Amino acid sequence: EQLAAVQHYFIHSHTVTQLYTAGKYELEALELINRLFDEGHETLVMAGGSGFYIDALVNGLDDFPSADLQLRNDLMARLKEEGVEGLRQELRHLDPESYATIDIANGQRVVRALEVCLMTGKPFSSFKTSQAKRRDFEIEKIGLTRPREELYDRINRRVIHMVEEGLVEEVRGLTQYRDLAALQTVGYKEIFDWFDYEAGLVSAEGWTPNTPGDGPVTSLDRAVELIQRNTRHYAKRQLSYWGRDKSIRWLTL
């Protein structure tokens, strides 16, 4: 309905198999913005989203170091064998700012941030430019918020709506791509974990509620609970991150 009412960009624009970075987004978004202004548009709205990508467009990024494939493969092996929690805590120790701003439920993003930290000895977040790049347009930041209880209720209901609209079928159709970065995100990972349990690849034997971690995803209901919880946690981190930006004008819905 929203897509039909207003022209949107960067939706259905890339495939899950494409490697996409904040640096690429900065370049492509600036090119699009300049074109739209040249066509006569006076005001453009950027809606989101990932703090890292918004910073890339608003302030620009320094050049990030090239990937260390051996280190990345080692970290990806740890992610697969140990899960994301240990990597998260390592990132939290090495780079608290990145821990607070990236989607830490996305194992691929945690791996990339850790890769840069370990390879350079500097925080991943330090590569965000300390001096904002000049843009040829004015930027006004508007933040939308609502009471926490209402926000969480809307998140919970939205997840249920996503399932009713075919989330499980969508994820099932993407199973062969599950290791790609684009699918290491909240909403996909939990469903994949449920599929693994259903296929007998994961056992609940020996697991109790006191066992560290989330345990096996033994039902769709459990997957939905985890998606709701992880989305709430992500929203909380986003609010904390944006709350430190004094240039934002906040509106309560």
Can you say where each PLM-predicted feature lies in the sequence?
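Phosphate/pyrophosphate-binding catalytic cores of soluble transferases and nucleic-acid-acting enzymes
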Residues: E1-L253
